[in-house]
């Protein structure tokens, strides 16, 4: 049976956690941030957990993660 391909777009955006979940960067941080408050930018700085509903599709997209 051939190897399964990893979706490279998903591999760039998501990282697997130790317990089997996935984390991703917060959205709305790329540009046009001058109108945001410092508090808003600070809260967007970290990583977010992916919802459990979406983890099954991520497992299919990244079979070796």
UniProtKB/Swiss-Prot annotation:
GO cellular component, as recorded: cytosolic large ribosomal subunit
Positions of region (Disordered): 1-23, 36-65
The protein, known as: Large ribosomal subunit protein bL35
Gene3D superfamilies: 4.10.410.60
Family: Belongs to the bacterial ribosomal protein bL35 family.
UniProt GO MF annotations: structural constituent of ribosome
Keywords: Ribonucleoprotein, Ribosomal protein
GO biological process, one term: translation
Biased composition (Polar residues): 54-65
Secretion signal span: none
């Amino acid at each position: 049976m051939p190897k399964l391909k990893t979706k490279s777009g998903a591999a760039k955006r998501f990282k697997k956690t130790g317990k089997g979940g996935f984390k991703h960067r917060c959205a709305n941080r790329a540009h046009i941030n001058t109108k945001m408050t410092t508090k808003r930018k600070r809260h967007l700085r970290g990583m977010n957990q992916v919802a459990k509903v979406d983890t099954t599709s991520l497992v299919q997209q990244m079979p070796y993660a």
